Amino acid sequence: MKLNIIVCVKSVVIGAPEGRVVRSSEFCELNPYDRPALEIALNLREAYGGAVTTVSMGPESSEIALIETMALGVDRSILLCDSALAGSDTLATATALGAAIKKLTPFDLVLFGIRTADSDTGQVGPQTAILLNLPSVTWVYSIEPAKNKFFVERRADGFREKFALPLPALVTVHPASIQPRDVGLHGIQSAFAARKVEFWNLKELGLSPEQVGEPGSPTQVISLKRVKKVRKCKFLTGSTEEQAQDLARLFVDTGFVG
C-alpha cells in the first residue's frame, strides 16, 4: 500500500529585532511544530512506500525551510510564492494551500503541525480540511494505515480517542507524538546544492487576487506587541479562618467576585 503524503509546513520568524516581523532567511527556520508531522510522513513512506511532498506559502526566503525538508528526505517541495499572497490571514492561507493540494491530486494523507511558532492560531489545518471537504482529526499521536482508511489516535482531556478516517484525510499532529530525526550534514549539503524547490504562483494555483492576500482575508492584524507579564505574590497568614476571610476580601477587592 503505497502512500502519497502531503505535509504543509511554514517558515517561522526567530530572533527578529524587537517589535518587528522580519521574514528574511537569517531570521527564519522551519516551524518546529511541523517537524513531528514531517517525521510521521517519512516513517510512513519508509514502512509502506510512496512519496512525501512538502508545501509551504511565503516569500522567497521561505525556500530555506523547504530545503531543510529536502535534506530530511522528502521527495518534492513546493513553495507558493506570489506578491498577491502577502497579508493573507488563516482562511486565505488555507485557500492557497487547498488549491495546491488539489493540484497534487491524487493523495492519501495531508499532515499539518498543530500550530505555528509565530502566529500560534492552529486554524489553517482545520480550515484547509473544510475547504477540501476532507475528514479531519486534530492533535493526532499515531497513524496506522489500513485498507482504504487510516486509524488515528488523539489525546485530549486525559482521554485517548481512536478514529477511522476514510482516504484521503487530513490530520494535525501533536508535537509530543514522535521525536523528529536530526538533519545530517551530507543531506544539508546535497539539498542546498540541488535547490530543487518548485515555485508556484497564483496563476498556477488557479486563484484570483481577490481570493487571497488582504482582499481574501476576512480578518486583519491591527498591531503586534509583546505582552509583559507582571506577577505579584501575596502570602496569607494567620489562622485558617483569618486566611479564609482575607482571601474572600481579596476576591471582592480585585473584582474576581461581586
Regions found by a protein language model. Name each.
Residues M1-G258:
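N-terminal glycine-rich FAD/FM-binding segment characteristic of electron-transfer flavoproteins
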